[in-house]
Amino acid sequence: MTELTLKPGTLTLAQLRAIHAAPVRLQLDASAAPAIDASVACVEQIIAEDRTAYGINTGFGLLASTRIASHDLENLQRSLVLSHAAGIGAPLDDDLVRLIMVLKINSLSRGFSGIRRKVIDALIALVNAEVYPHIPLKGSVGASGDLAPLAHMSLVLLGEGKARYKGQWLSATEALAVAGLEPLTLAAKEGLALLNGTQASTAYALRGLFYAEDLYAAAIACGGLSVEAVLGSRSPFDARIHEARGQRGQIDTAACFRDLLGDSSEVSLSHKNCDKVQDPYSLRCQPQVMGACLTQLRQAAEVLGIEANAVSDNPLVFAAEGDVISGGNFHAEPVAMAADNLALAIAEIGSLSERRISLMMDKHMSQLPPFLVENGGVNSGFMIAQVTAAALASENKALSHPHSVDSLPTSANQEDHVSMAPAAGKRLWEMAENTRGVLAIEWLGACQGLDLRKGLKTSAKLEKARQALRSEVAHYDRDRFFAPDIEKAVELLAKGSLTGLLPAGVLPSL
């Protein structure tokens, strides 16, 4: 298990990817304690002085003007968690719940939330014990924070709801016992601090980012294999072309292709003096299209990296001045827009890959047997696999519609503009699955095309990509049940089998 000493506000994208990928043992850096304690003392002073402060001794949302008596403050926090745990849908996977919890711990530990170390330590204990609260997929509009998902996360601390441990559902009290805990009684402000925030939205989008990075890497490898399979040119990847334009994503993408393709190969030397002048756009313009996608990934990663370390609670406690100020950091618009841009990139990666698959099907364009199989007519080869790729790419065009432009007023129009960031983030997973399927078919097709080049080898790195597939999926000498081969290629891509072929430093979290 990975061990991480958390210094609040300093999580890196690489650490976030690791937290999403596998269980982690957290320890809070000792430097966090003074700020946490000071914020709690500030809240306690406000109560002692009988000052009115939103979320501490008032109602919530449209009920913010309702003053709550001091003897009801603990009940207020418990009622808040119970009433807001109103999500619906399938439970989130452990990897997502873990990421949400670590993001919440990171935010609360910065010392602007007025929540005791005891509560933060309880969340840490759950993470370390691999006890993951039941959080339904749906129920948040991304403002005022991810209230329903985070309420479900918080239920377990109160001894309510349920949690998963080693694949089994336990009651909250059983789950707490596994982590060596007992149910907590929340103090003033603590329920609101737990519920307010963009941690679910951010986790949803971060998963989409990690998937998109792996898809980008796979698309570069598959695109390089396709260049070789159809006897394409290396000239479009010449650094001078891309430096002349100046787009950094394009420049770096072209460099990735040069690294994978090398200066030459047996395949490229076999058509060195051919009379073909230019390749189709799906081959020639890969640096331009994939470079634009890389730029979107990097920009989204920057936004999400900031949000992962943000304080998105409301109100915020500024202990040094003794102030508690209401604002709107819970509004997840930055996350929604980042997710929307990731959707564009994921859709385009799949769209370009589908065009290369189609190119390989056409004997006039590819100089390969129709549908990549010999004895055509008796054999249909990749004919319907390409149709599947087209269906997946088409689905993604609809799914890529932006969510951040949508809004529905909630809480009796008090919360009259919302981000829809959770929906923006979670559709990325389906889109990634679709694009992974398209790339799997291209990978199968490009390797088949290279096989048909009668023993010619491509570059050393692309041969690794080829053999990674061929170690699991055999060449097609005749038609066979196709779906299992696509499933195996998808499985390999989901494991990141091609991600390691990219040079270090290209992708934000790798």
UniProtKB/Swiss-Prot annotation:
Keywords: Cytoplasm, Histidine metabolism, Lyase. The modification 2,3-didehydroalanine (Ser) is found at S144. It catalyses: L-histidine = trans-urocanate + NH4(+). GO terms for molecular function: histidine ammonia-lyase activity. Pathway: Amino-acid degradation; L-histidine degradation into L-glutamate; N-formimidoyl-L-glutamate from L-histidine: step 1/3. Its main location: cytoplasm. Contains an active site 4-methylidene-imidazol-5-one (MIO), which is formed autocatalytically by cyclization and dehydration of residues Ala-Ser-Gly. Induction: By histidine and urocanate. Its EC number is 4.3.1.3. The keyword Lyase applies. Belongs to the PAL/histidase family. This is Histidine ammonia-lyase. It comes from Pseudomonas putida (Arthrobacter siderocapsulatus).
